[in-house]
A protein has these predicted regions:
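Short beta->alpha transition motifs characteristic of CBS
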Residues: 126-133
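Residues that form or immediately flank small-molecule/cofactor binding pockets and catalytic motifs
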Residues: 13-16, 53, 100, 131
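Vicinal oxygen chelate
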Residues: 40-43, 50-120
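Core segments of cupin and vicinal oxygen chelate
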Residues: 1-43, 90, 107-109, 117, ...
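Hydrophobic beta-strand residues in large extracellular and virion-surface proteins
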Residues: 35, 46-48, 126
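Flexible, disordered linker segments and immediate boundary regions flanking tandem C2H2 zinc-finger modules
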Residues: 136-137
């Protein structure tokens, strides 16, 4: 949230039998964190679920997007890619591979893609205006 600029809003908890009844957990309680990108009514909201499970989680090798099945990729559109890069570095993250890059020919050329990886190894694609470095290529 601090890297991209999300603001944490009031979250909620889901306990009791419900998480198991709908197939989310094996009975463990959920704590849902709600993040919002901007103050507008239509601003993007992201809900992250934290599970208080007694079982140890399995760490997977997510070197590339195709090395695991399931969701491992999230795209977020921002107004300032350079600010995201600064925030990422401040929190110990660096751009993944050789990103940011201008989109390939045939796609908008005034937009760049920054790839980050979250602490769980998921890919977080940041799309927004070109950075100064890319503008001056």
């Amino acid at each position: 949230k601090n890297v991209i600029g999300f603001q944490e809003k009031e979250g909620f908890k889901v306990a009791g039998k419900f998480p198991k009844l709908v197939g989310l957990t094996d009975g463990a309680n959920l704590e849902i964190h709600v993040l919002k990108l901007g103050d507008e009514k239509t601003a993007t909201k992201l809900k992250l679920m934290q599970v208080n499970a007694k079982k140890k989680t399995q760490i997977l090798d997510q070197s590339y997007i195709h090395t695991v099945t399931g969701f491992s990729y999230l795209t977020i559109f921002v107004n300032d890619v350079e600010q995201v890069i600064k925030n990422a570095k401040k929190h110990g993250y660096k751009p993944h591979a050789q990103s940011p890059q201008i989109l390939p020919p045939g796609l908008p050329q005034d937009v760049c893609l920054l790839m980050l990886k979250d602490p769980d190894g998921n890919f977080v694609e940041i799309v927004g205006p070109l950075t100064e470095k890319l503008k001056n290529r």
